[in-house]
Amino acid sequence: MKKTLLASSLAVGLGIVAGNAGHEAHASEADLNKASLAQMAQSNDQTLNQKPIEAGAYNYTFDYEGFTYHFESDGTHFAWNYHATGTNGADMSAQAPATNNVAPSAVQANQVQSQEVEAPQNAQTQQPQASTSNNSQVTATPTESKSSEGSSVNVNAHLKQIAQRESGGNIHAVNPTSGAAGKYQFLQSTWDSVAPAKYKGVSPANAPESVQDAAAVKLYNTGGAGHWVTA
């Protein structure tokens, strides 16, 4: 699953310089907060998609709690990915080429172009997956439901496509690796931020379809489709 982001201008102080200025090193040679970077990657923190982890060129690879993480930049483009240690495929990767040449202390205009996200291209290489893993299978309870007939919530066409890609429309789907659950594969922290009080702390997969639909609409209306890798 690949996610590409394009930025037309950079925020203050990013310090990105075109060319290969900077340094390259493995994580063992650098003072990196591995736990923090791993957590940001696992949760698809948008900070990683908006700017590099440091100025200049770098190339870091490290293992942490069963996963291998890679962060790199040539000073113009930056990217990151991670995958289960010992496997060849990356769970998630992101690239953000900077189109402007910027001095380290330069201040740019604060206009930022909307992120452009690649949709899955074909059935062979892009299967409906949970938000954070290409290598995980979504499982469901025996009472699964795969239609939206049980909901009266008005869900737009884009959200319906997201639901199909994330879970096949199954409201009881659960990703055993990431813990993402429900029709829209909510992470628990995201679900708790948009779910009604009655369902906070409850797995999204155990909530009625109408509640899941309403939460997804709320999340979509406030943050757009960027919450879903498959959007």
From Swiss-Prot:
Q: Which residues form the signal peptide?
A: 1-27
Q: Chief subcellular site? A: secreted
The cellular component terms of Gene Ontology attached to this UniProt record, alphabetical and capped at eight, are: extracellular region
Low complexity bias locations: 119-137
Q: Which GO terms describe its molecular function?
A: hydrolase activity, acting on glycosyl bonds
Reported EC number(s) for this entry are 3.2.-.-
**Sorted UniProt keywords:** Glycosidase, Hydrolase, Secreted, Signal
Q: Which residues fall in a compositionally biased region of kind Polar residues? A: 106-116, 138-153
Region Disordered, annotated ranges: 106-153
Q: What happens when the gene is disrupted?
A: Cells grow slightly less well than wild-type in the presence of 2.5 M NaCl. Inactivation of both isaA and sceD genes results in a high degree of clumping and the double mutant is also attenuated for virulence.
Enumerate the subcellular locations listed in this protein's record, separating them with semicolons.
Secreted
Which InterPro entries did the record assign? Lysozyme-like_dom_sf (IPR023346), RPF (IPR010618)
Purpose of the protein: Is able to cleave peptidoglycan and affects clumping and separation of bacterial cells. Is required for normal growth under stressful conditions. Is essential for nasal colonization.
Family the entry assigns: Belongs to the transglycosylase family. SceD subfamily.
Protein name per its UniProtKB record: Probable transglycosylase SceD
